[in-house]
Amino acid sequence: MLERIRDSFTESIQTKIDAAEALPESIEKAAEMMVQCLLGGNKILSCGNGGSAGDAQHFSAELLNRYEIERPPLPAIALSCDTSTITAIANDYSYDEIFSKQIFALGQPGDILLAISTSGNSGNIIKAMEAALSRDMTIVALTGKDGGAMAGLMSAGDVEIRVPSNVTARIQEVHLLVIHCLCDNIDRTLFPQDEQA
């Protein structure tokens, strides 16, 4: 068991090294898009399933509260938090529509959808992306593996941040780091006077 634990750390480190080579430009582009969205008076909606739902909530919490510097709250909504809404939609319609119906109600042109799926094939995330596109929103997708069906929905104005791994746990670990990079870039761009040395 000790060897398995050490292997998990080693694999996680290697995946992050690979991601450090592959992802910085797309992370920077996504952060710039988010900054422009927020400066334009818009908001960022986020969604995911399971651990990715936790990541969506984590991102939203960092924007609504703060990341590492003191600053005003920034508008973000995690679509995985309202159990009454989610269960009503799943019961009356379909689990695949739990995020898309919220996007049709809350999403506005100029908003961003942060869509998170390690496989890129989650049905409700695909529907969420389709809803966002119909609302003239921009999409930032956090994926892994081969990008799945989500990769095929991306337009030139969207950004896919695809973790170079086929292991769900490693993808999730890098997704969290990507989220922290996005939050850091947003904060440091919007509030440069608060930047620490």
Curated annotation (Swiss-Prot):
It catalyses: 2 D-sedoheptulose 7-phosphate = D-glycero-alpha-D-manno-heptose 7-phosphate + D-glycero-beta-D-manno-heptose 7-phosphate. This is Phosphoheptose isomerase. It is found in: Cytoplasm. It is an enzyme of class 5 (isomerase). Homotetramer. It comes from Shewanella frigidimarina (strain NCIMB 400). Residues 34-196 form the SIS domain. Belongs to the SIS family. GmhA subfamily. Gene3D superfamilies: Glucose-6-phosphate isomerase like protein, domain 1. The gene is gmhA. InterPro entries: GmhA/DiaA (IPR035461), Phosphoheptose_Isoase (IPR004515), SIS_dom (IPR001347), SIS_dom_sf (IPR046348), SIS_GmhA/DiaA_subfam (IPR050099). One of its GO terms (cellular component) is cytoplasm. Catalyzes the isomerization of sedoheptulose 7-phosphate in D-glycero-D-manno-heptose 7-phosphate. Its cofactor is Zn(2+). Binds 1 zinc ion per subunit. Keywords: Carbohydrate metabolism, Cytoplasm, Isomerase, Metal-binding, Zinc. GO terms for molecular function: carbohydrate derivative binding; D-sedoheptulose 7-phosphate isomerase activity; zinc ion binding. Substrate binds at residues 49-51, 62, 91-92, 117-119, 122, 172. Its EC number is 5.3.1.28. One of its GO terms (biological process) is carbohydrate metabolic process.
